[in-house]
């Protein structure tokens, strides 16, 4: 067994033995989901996100690919794909880091300290810089709608969109049961 594959297995086992819920895809160690809780003292506290992680063949010498499956409102996360703009993972990754670092350090730092000057979600970045209270309210709305603990995050995919009513309406008569699910036909 080569060194990168041994390291991949060791890092996966370390992650699985931590407090994170890990679900492998296709019974392999190359792709998996991790349940990630929003960091304390952040706008995301109390939210739970499903994160997809893909390990390249050259892991740990090449960084893992990380993306939010559960929809999140953040300047550095693409709202449609869930892709994360995270320099530490994408550009400054080192083989000294492991998978637990991604979930205990890198993602919490991203959520605690968004960078609106290097956005993947331009609308979130603009709102954050222009109207901080409105931005914070939108983050909380997304957390309440999509990142509730204990609910199936498959129904809250990053490529799902809010309807016009859900996105910006003050109409309290809206029926929240009519949530569109990405990849499924409308009834």
Swiss-Prot record:
Alphabetically ordered keywords of this record: ATP-binding, Nucleotide-binding, Transferase, Ubl conjugation pathway
Gene Ontology molecular function: any one: ubiquitin-protein transferase activity
Catalytic activity field: S-ubiquitinyl-[E1 ubiquitin-activating enzyme]-L-cysteine + [E2 ubiquitin-conjugating enzyme]-L-cysteine = [E1 ubiquitin-activating enzyme]-L-cysteine + S-ubiquitinyl-[E2 ubiquitin-conjugating enzyme]-L-cysteine
Positions of region (Disordered): 145-187
Regions of compositional bias (Basic and acidic residues) in chain numbering: 145-156
Pfam family, one: UQ_con
Active site annotation, chain numbering: 85
Enzymatic class: transferase
Free-text tissue specificity from the UniProt record: Expressed in antipodal cells of developing seeds and in the vascular junction between the cotyledons or leaves and the hypocotyl. Not expressed in pollen.
Induction, per UniProt: Not induced by heat shock.
Gene3D superfamilies: Ubiquitin Conjugating Enzyme
GO biological-process terms attached to the record: protein ubiquitination; ubiquitin-dependent protein catabolic process
Comp. bias (Acidic residues): 157-179
Residue stretches making up the UBC core domain: 1-148
Keyword check for Cytoplasm: no
SMART domains: UBCc
EC number, as in UniProt: 2.3.2.23
Matching InterPro entries: UBQ-conjugat_E2_core, UBQ-conjugating_AS, UBQ-conjugating_enzyme/RWD
Pathway annotation: Protein modification; protein ubiquitination
Domain of life: Eukaryota
Family listed: Belongs to the ubiquitin-conjugating enzyme family.
Record's function text: Accepts the ubiquitin from the E1 complex and catalyzes its covalent attachment to other proteins.
Name used for this protein in its record: Ubiquitin-conjugating enzyme E2 4
């Amino acid at each position: 067994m080569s060194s990168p594959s041994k390291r991949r297995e060791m890092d996966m086992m370390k992650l699985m033995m931590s407090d994170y819920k890990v679900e492998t895809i296709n019974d392999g160690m190359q792709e998996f989901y991790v349940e990630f809780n929003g960091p304390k003292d952040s706008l995301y506290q109390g939210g739970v996100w499903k994160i997809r992680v893909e390990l390249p063949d050259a892991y740990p010498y090449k960084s893992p690919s990380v993306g939010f499956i559960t929809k999140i409102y953040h300047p550095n996360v693409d709202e449609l794909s869930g892709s994360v703009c995270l320099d530490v993972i994408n550009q400054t990754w080192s083989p000294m880091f492991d998978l637990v670092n991604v979930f205990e350090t890198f993602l919490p730092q991203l959520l605690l300290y968004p960078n609106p000057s290097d956005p993947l979600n331009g609308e979130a970045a603009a709102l954050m810089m222009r109207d901080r209270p409105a931005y914070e309210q939108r983050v909380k709305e997304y957390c309440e709608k999509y990142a509730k603990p204990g609910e199936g995050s498959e129904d809250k995919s990053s490529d799902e969109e809010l309807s016009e009513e859900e996105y910006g309406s003050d109409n309290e008569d809206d029926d929240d049961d009519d949530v569109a699910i990405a990849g499924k036909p409308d009834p």
